[in-house]
Amino acid sequence: MTQRQVEVDGQTFTLDPQGIRTSLTDGPPMLWGFQVRVLDGERELGIKTCFVGRVSVQFRDASAPDGPIDVLLPVLHELAFEKIEARLREGEPGDEILFA
């Protein structure tokens, strides 16, 4: 899993994604969930619990939802990071649930 550094108003945050879980279904997965730790250096400021839906993933990359994890993972992370960065710009580094 790839960390990302984000700069907001002169402050650098590190986004540290954790393991992914998929929705339990007999059909194709419709939802993926994972946590992203928001760090200021080594200090944890919050945990963003992110849920990303199949439609969002398909819109970004049509092959990703049913593709191998190395294709799916970057799309999931990118969608979550975009939401988290927007929340950081609004001054919200703490714990919360986000949907993408």
Where do the model's predicted regions map?
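Negatively charged, low-complexity tracts enriched in Asp/Glu with abundant Ser/Thr
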Residues: M1-P29
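Short aromatic-centered micro-motifs
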Residues: V6, V38, C50
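A short beta-strand signature
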Residues: M30-G41
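A generic structural signal for solvent-exposed, polar alpha-helical segments
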Residues: G19, V38-D40, V57, P65
